[in-house]
């Protein structure tokens, strides 16, 4: 029990910096689910916009960055939330999601949206956090909404 408490107390959230980009790419490509078939689909311009203009947070522990989230504060869309496979179940995803939705509330949003693959662990994670499925988009991904 004390190991669980100790691990969770060592998690830190902070804004992402340019110095985090190599590790952010490792995290993004270090997930078994939702692999990018073409890594060039996520452009440096897109990542730079989120870093400069949106909510872009990392979760780290004593080892380093283990997860990140990017949220468009203008639309309430959660563009990305990833935790590297070896760090699942340690609270990184929950803390990132809670912080992102809190920030959206602070800027006046009453709801948030995201999409994820159908039948994935991510789908179960979002459902367990109270996100409601709204149907599927044209790519077959589940569209979720959370009232803030």
Question: Where are the language model's segments positioned?
Answer:
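Extreme N-terminus of proteins, especially the signal/transit-peptide cleavage junction
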Residues: 3-11
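Conserved GNAT acetyl-CoA-binding A-motif
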Residues: 104-117
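Conserved acetyl-CoA-binding loop-helix of GNAT-fold acetyltransferases
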Residues: 89-102, 127-128
């Amino acid at each position: 029990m004390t190991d669980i408490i100790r691990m969770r107390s060592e998690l830190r959230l902070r804004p992402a910096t340019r110095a985090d980009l190599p590790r952010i790419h490792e995290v993004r490509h270090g997930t078994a689910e939702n692999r990018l078939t073409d890594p060039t689909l996520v452009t440096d311009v897109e990542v730079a916009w989120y870093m400069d203009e949106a909510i872009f947070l990392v979760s780290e522990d004593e080892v380093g960055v283990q997860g990140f989230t990017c949220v468009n504060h203008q639309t309430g869309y959660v563009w990305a939330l990833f935790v590297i496979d070896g760090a699942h179940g340690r609270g990184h995803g929950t803390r990132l999601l809670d912080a992102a939705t809190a920030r959206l509330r602070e800027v006046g949003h009453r709801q948030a949206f995201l999409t994820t693959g159908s039948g994935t662990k991510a789908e179960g994670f979002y459902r367990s956090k109270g996100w409601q499925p709204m149907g599927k988009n044209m790519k077959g991904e589940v569209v979720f909404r959370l009232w803030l």
